[in-house]
Regions:
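Solvent-exposed, conformationally flexible loop/turn segments
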Residues: 7-11, 61-68, 101-107, 155
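Surface-exposed loop/edge segments in extracytoplasmic proteins
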Residues: 2, 48-56, 92-94, 129-132
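Intrinsically disordered, low-complexity Pro/Gly/Ser/Thr-rich segments with frequent PxxP/GP/PP motifs
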Residues: 47-86
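C-terminal interaction-tip segments
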Residues: 1-22, 26, 30-35, 39, ...
Length: 171
């Protein structure tokens, strides 16, 4: 039976704990980020033995799937756990402009392409303030997770720091 994970961000995450007794034959990794590639480290680790990399710094293009098969490691008690670490994509300048009016969580865009350029979890930088996208409702309407500090100047070149998004399937 396959196990599925949606992984985001740059923190190391445990996919399988040592002692899970999961038989691993194949691991599929898909970059689901809309606008940037990401790097993947996939490794097994055992206490007092160390880390053994299956993939190290492998770049996953947008929408690409990498299938790692012919894999065999022990996931029994006191054996190996399976871990993943992602590296986010490069910062880019968004299309259009953003004019924040007041201390609220709205992200009003003009000629922006939120639905194709942003994903929930991405950070945007508007007039020097950085916020995390919590929802996207259209090309010119989005919401951030924390209120803006003030009525900001119209930013004609807002930046996006995309968060790595990878789907993992373990068979």
């Amino acid at each position: 039976m396959a196990t599925h994970f949606n992984i985001s961000g740059e923190l190391t995450q445990e996919l399988l704990a040592a002692g899970s007794n999961v038989s691993v034959n194949k691991i599929s990794l898909t970059n689901t980020q809309k606008v940037s590639k990401c790097k993947v480290d996939l490794y097994i680790e055992k206490k007092l033995t160390g880390k053994f990399y299956l993939l190290k710094g492998v770049e996953l293009p947008i929408g690409a799937t990498l299938v790692y098969d012919d894999i065999n490691f022990s996931n029994a008690a006191n054996e190996f756990g399976l871990y993943i670490k992602l590296t986010d994509g490069a910062t880019f300048t968004m299309t259009g402009s953003i004019d924040v009016t007041g201390t609220n969580t709205n992200v009003p865009g003009t000629n922006t392409l939120y639905t194709s350029e942003l994903s929930v979890g991405d950070e945007i930088v508007v007039s020097g303030e950085t916020r995390t996208i919590s929802s996207i409702t259209g090309n010119t309407t989005a919401v951030v997770s924390a209120a803006w500090g003030s009525d900001l100047a119209n930013d004609t070149s807002p930046d996006c720091n995309p968060t790595a998004l990878v789907d993992v399937i373990i068979n």
